[in-house]
Amino acid sequence: MIPYGDFTFFLIALIALLPVIILGFLGKRSYIYNGVVTAFMIVLIFSSDKHNLFDQKYLSVQLISFIIYVVWQVLLIMFYYHSKPKNNSFSKFVTVMVLSILPLALVKVLQSTWLGGHQIHFHESKLIEFVGFLGISYVTFKSVQLIMEIRDGSIKEIKVWKLIQFISFFPTISSGPIDRYKRFVKDDKKVPTGNEYRELVLKAIHMIMLGFLYKYIVAYFINTYAIMPLQLDLHGFVNLWLYMYAYSLYLFFDFAGYSLFAIAFSYLFGIKTPPNFDKPFKAKNIKDFWNRWHMTLSFWFRDCIYMRSLFYMSRKKLLKSQFAMSNVAFLINFFIMGIWHGIEVYYIVYGLYHAALFIGYDYYERWRKKHPPRWQNGFTTALSIVITFHFVTFGFLIFSGKLI
């Protein structure tokens, strides 16, 4: 069952969370019941009529893959956490990181169309249908972030149960938002008062209503009356251009709607999962856009890839210019972001396209410091928003695979 994919999911989830909500209004929390309802929802999410054991839909291959994955990540993280005080070598860190990312890398390779007719099959089905699970990318982000923070020394304590709870938190399991371990545990430890929980519930209701508007009304109409008709003929320039607008708006309303649902259900647990979107199409430049679009992903890449690449190059003095090192870090950052989406050519080009936009904007910012604008008013602000919007939507056209 796809999280937030139909009304049945909402009904089952809300019924399952009813004791959580009642206890929340009383200013209490049952960690045991939270664990039970999480396990129940995980089994439901990964249930499958096709790929299962003993013809039991709730004993699915995806569920087994998820359990194996969680055990694998917990063993890796706890091993690194306990062995780090004795040996925090770079080689050990890299080894643990590679082993943590390995399941995701395998899934991305098996998903790729590069294999063509050479897809590996198992019992007359593609192997990818038996490997991996819904949300493996986002769960891997959590694990990798945690390993990095252990190396940095910012994580002082990890308990196995809290780690499992963090990795398998069902409201955000399929597509984020991507939370941080320290922030998650802080919310989990602090039980909100009855009044505080009422505020969380009111915010959750608002987000659920807005999410329905975004995902099930606006995104549905865009897909039905714009994207689907345009896909019938994308050979003309005008149709391709209109598809670019429609697809970009659909991506936002569909994913923003999902994110609102995920955050709302997190709030019902008393967990204030961070937001994912902040009016991204009002961005005045490409940097502003990535501070507004898929923010938890953007900030994850900024902290885990860009900043660490820049720090490494600075420490090793690989380049003389800090500006040049920053641009190389942008290139690394967005290249990895591209292949994270998939190893298809258009995903890689999408990542490199945004790297080029960042590097180009960096050059523009340096030039602008020496040549301050003569006019800066509402018109110039609106113009910058329009220009940024078109650069961004063209990137989404690349991302859609319809251009390449």
Region spans (language model):
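Membrane-embedded transmembrane alpha-helical bundles that form the catalytic cores
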Residues: 1-404
